[in-house]
Each structure stands twice: as structure tokens, then as C-alpha cells.
């Protein structure tokens, strides 16, 4: 994970830009300059597709935590009001056979899910939130996973 870090300064490095829809002006606004103290642990981490791929596998198979802690985090519960195939553990989302997590904040959204049976990982990063700050990363992940692994999806 050479290109992942916890942001401590306003703004993002390099040429990366993120956009959110402003319903008043009916235009996309650049949300790139953000104060990492605001999201803190909920969104100040910056990473790349190539770093998130091995992280998703380690998150779901272990190697980051002690075995007992990993076993506890893998226990999951159904989410109220959601289909039965969606479950949440301790910092993990289970979508049927897929294990991983997602996040959306300030013009950016990500999905990273690992499919243990196939040793496959799908990572989606999107730098735009659409109307009402809705992300397309979930929709993209659900579509790609259904095309590549139809036998492992419940959607």
C-alpha cells in the first residue's frame, strides 16, 4: 500500500478532482479542497485502485488483525430494511458471496469487494456524485460483478 495515506492537509495531491451536484445552481461543484479533520476516520484516507485491490482481500481473509479479532469482525447481521443478502459486520459489508466495503464523501465514492471463492477483487472509484449526491460506484460494482460472476450475485 505504497500510495495510501491519511490526509492531514486541506486539498488533495496531484490532479485528482471530485465533483458534487449543486441543485441550486444546477451545476457540478469542485469538491477537491476539503478539510480532512471534518471526515476524519470516515473519509480522510486517500488511496489508489492498485492499493485497494490487495487491501480488500486482506480485509476479508485476514492478515491485518489477530485471528480472534478477524473472526469477530466477520460475524455479520442483516441490515434492517435491506434484502437478506446484504449484511454488515465490524467494518465489513457482505453482499451475498462478496466481502468488502464502500464509501462516499465530498465528490468521491469507492467500492472494493473481494470474492473469496474466485479469488477475485473488484474496485470502483468514481470522482463525481450525481443529483442529490448519489454515487454511481455502487451501481457500477453491481453491474460489473453481475457480468463477470453471475453465479455469485443475488441482485
How should these model regions be labeled?
Residues 1-18:
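Active-site helix/loop module of the DD-peptidase/beta-lactamase fold
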Amino acid at each position: 500500500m505504497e500510495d495510501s495515506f491519511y490526509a492531514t492537509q486541506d486539498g488533495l495531491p496531484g490532479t485528482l478532482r471530485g465533483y458534487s451536484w449543486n441543485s441550486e445552481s444546477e451545476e457540478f461543484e469542485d469538491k477537491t479542497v476539503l478539510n480532512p479533520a471534518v471526515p476524519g476516520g470516515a473519509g480522510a484516507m486517500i488511496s489508489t485502485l492498485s492499493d485497494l485491490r490487495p487491501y480488500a482481500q486482506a480485509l476479508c481473509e485476514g492478515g491485518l488483525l489477530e485471528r480472534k479479532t478477524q473472526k469477530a469482525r466477520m460475524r455479520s447481521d442483516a441490515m434492517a430494511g435491506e434484502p437478506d443478502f446484504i449484511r454488515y459486520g465490524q467494518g465489513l459489508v457482505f453482499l451475498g458471496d462478496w466481502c468488502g466495503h464502500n464509501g462516499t464523501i465530498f465528490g468521491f465514492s469507492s467500492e472494493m469487494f473481494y470474492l473469496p471463492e474466485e479469488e477475485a477483487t473488484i474496485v470502483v472509484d468514481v470522482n463525481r456524485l450525481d443529483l442529490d449526491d448519489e454515487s454511481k460506484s455502487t451501481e457500477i460494482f453491481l453491474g460489473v460483478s453481475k457480468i463477470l460472476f453471475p453465479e455469485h450475485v443475488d441482485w
